[in-house]
Amino acid sequence: MSATLPDIAVTEPSALHAPLRWVGMQDIAIPVRLDEAEPSGTVAARAQVQVDLPRPELKGIHMSRLYRLLDRHLEQPLSPAMLSQLLQAMIDSHADCGSRAARVSLAFEVMLRMPALRSEGLAGWRAYPVRIDAQSRAGRSEMRLQIDVLYASTCPCSAALSRQLLSKAFAQQHAGQTALRVEDVAQWLQRNGSYATPHSQRSVAQVRVDLVARVQSFDIRALVLLCESALATPVQAAVRRIDEQAFARLNGANLMYVEDAARRLRKELAERYASFHVAVRHFESLHAHDAVAETGSDADVFHMIAESHGQ
């Protein structure tokens, strides 16, 4: 003899009648198949799945249905088309709740193998935090891709102050001399060229782009390379001395305030995406606080200040 298991969400009405904008689950651990992921093609992700609950008298949604749909769909390689199918399946599974909207979020790190700046055949792994958000409402799907890119930033003002100190030191040590041999100047610079080091630091750019309808893939690597090319000083993995020297040269040739970094990214993104947002943060080596800048394509007048996360 089998007894029917109780389902309170179905059999008992809500004591307080009110529609709910979103109901679901977050921080679901799940593997994601990603063609761009190296070396295995699978990444460990954290997922959020939610639907709306417009019927005010219903006590709750069917959480297990959402979990099973997420699990089943993510057996396929991740793509915009697959996420669109998942969103529609989530809505269809809650027809008895009157649901008309669904949203999914996936957060993970993708590992990309990047070559050294100069050393032939040398490469190393770099991890890039990624977030993908997808939402469907009234038959219309929207998708957004977000990545974090680490880079080095060197303060233009600090570099100018350093050059001034070097110039003064050279003038003081060679006062009264009317002619200097090139090799003597070169030797002096070799000994004293780092009289003062401008303050530089690791920095992060968080870039978010809205994807156009019917896009075939997320193409995470392409967005990473676009951002790193715009900034010109991405952090490195495997390096030898020749690569470290090349990195120093790049930093010296690309001095930038936080404003410069944001504008560089804006210029490149505006040529390829109709809708995007950029938030850059420099973990200042001189100060006990960070420098930040934001830009984007949207026309919103008011934005909440982003929550700070220590690095």
UniProtKB/Swiss-Prot annotation:
Record EC number: 3.5.4.16
Q: Which Pfam families match?
A: GCHY-1 (PF02649)
UniProt catalytic activity: GTP + H2O = 7,8-dihydroneopterin 3'-triphosphate + formate + H(+)
Which GO MF terms does the UniProt record name? GTP cyclohydrolase I activity
The site annotation (May be catalytically important) covers C155
* UniProt xrefs under InterPro entries: GTP_cyclohydrolase_FolE2 (IPR022838), GTP_cyclohydrolase_FolE2/MptA (IPR003801)
Which UniProt keyword terms apply here?
Answer: Hydrolase
Pathway noted in the entry: Cofactor biosynthesis; 7,8-dihydroneopterin triphosphate biosynthesis; 7,8-dihydroneopterin triphosphate from GTP: step 1/1
Task: Give the top-rank taxon of the lineage listed in the UniProt record for this protein.
Answer: Bacteria
One BP term from GO: tetrahydrofolate biosynthetic process
Is Phosphoprotein given among the entry's keywords? no
Question: Is Hydrolase among this UniProt entry's keywords?
Answer: yes
Biological role: Converts GTP to 7,8-dihydroneopterin triphosphate.
The protein's matches in PANTHER family, at most eight in alphabetical order, are given as: GTP CYCLOHYDROLASE MPTA
Q: Which family does it belong to?
A: Belongs to the GTP cyclohydrolase IV family.
Protein name stated in the entry:
GTP cyclohydrolase FolE2
Taxonomy of origin reads:
Bacteria, Pseudomonadati, Pseudomonadota, Gammaproteobacteria, Lysobacterales
Q: Which gene encodes it?
A: folE2
